[in-house]
């Protein structure tokens, strides 16, 4: 705790805004990575998309940010704008994107996800910039390297955790839904040649769709939980070189 030059300065966690930013950063990265993994997994398993086809959809998330990123920076640099509410709007947009995606059916393809991708393109800069402002607003210049260490650690952990959690939950929920669907078939088709195998494939396919919907709703719940955290934890900060009204 009293080490003169620690790699992780635990005392910085006593700053509410920094602690909030680290928690929310981890949550936001979980949401972002999860949305990519769920969507790409669905398109690969149900529509047979290859990686380059999924990458085309990801461009709908990345390229619009070349426009939205500077706009959000200008907005957050306005003293009258409370960046906490910019962050709240961002999380609500992410939750909306997840709820829309949870309505997916086996007929959905990459084109169907474009509106959802555009919502992400707007929401992501609206989350990252306010989080950086909240984290750095009350720090001294000498605290910068220690804060960077915390941010990098959270980023690495969140990305790894999201990938592992989505893979595990997708398999568990997929098996559960596939088993439930298969039980509903009964034995009426068991006498037909090849029917059992066909029904198993159909159950697995529909089970993956339902599992993807479950995961989208779970991620939406995380976004709403982080939105509620904004109401109780962070304090307002102002842009650099601005005077509070």
Residues of each region from the PLM?
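Hydrophobic transmembrane architecture of multi-pass small-molecule transporters
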Residues: 132, 138, 150-245
């Amino acid at each position: 705790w009293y080490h003169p030059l620690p790699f992780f300065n635990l005392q910085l966690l006593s700053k509410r805004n920094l602690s909030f930013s680290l928690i929310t950063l981890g949550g936001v990265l979980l949401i972002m990575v999860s949305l990519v993994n769920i969507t790409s997994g669905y398109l690969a398993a149900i529509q047979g998309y290859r990686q380059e086809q999924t990458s085309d959809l990801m461009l709908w998330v990345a390229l619009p940010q070349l426009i939205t990123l500077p706009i959000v920076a200008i907005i957050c640099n306005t003293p009258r704008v409370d960046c906490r509410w910019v962050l709240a709007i961002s999380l609500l947009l992410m939750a909306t994107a997840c709820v829309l995606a949870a309505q997916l059916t086996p007929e959905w393809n990459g084109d169907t996800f474009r509106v959802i991708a555009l919502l992400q393109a707007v929401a992501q800069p609206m989350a990252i910039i306010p989080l950086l402002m909240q984290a750095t607003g009350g720090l001294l210049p000498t605290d910068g390297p220690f804060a960077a260490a915390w941010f990098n650690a959270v980023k690495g952990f969140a990305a790894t955790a999201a990938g592992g959690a989505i893979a595990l939950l997708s398999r568990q929920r997929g098996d559960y839904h596939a088993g439930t669907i298969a039980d509903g078939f009964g034995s009426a088709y068991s006498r037909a040649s090849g029917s059992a195998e066909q029904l198993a494939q159909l159950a697995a396919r529909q089970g993956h769709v339902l599992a993807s919907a479950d995961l989208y709703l779970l991620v939406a719940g995380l976004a709403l939980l982080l939105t509620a955290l904004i109401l109780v934890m962070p304090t307002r900060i102002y842009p650099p070189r601005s005077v509070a009204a």
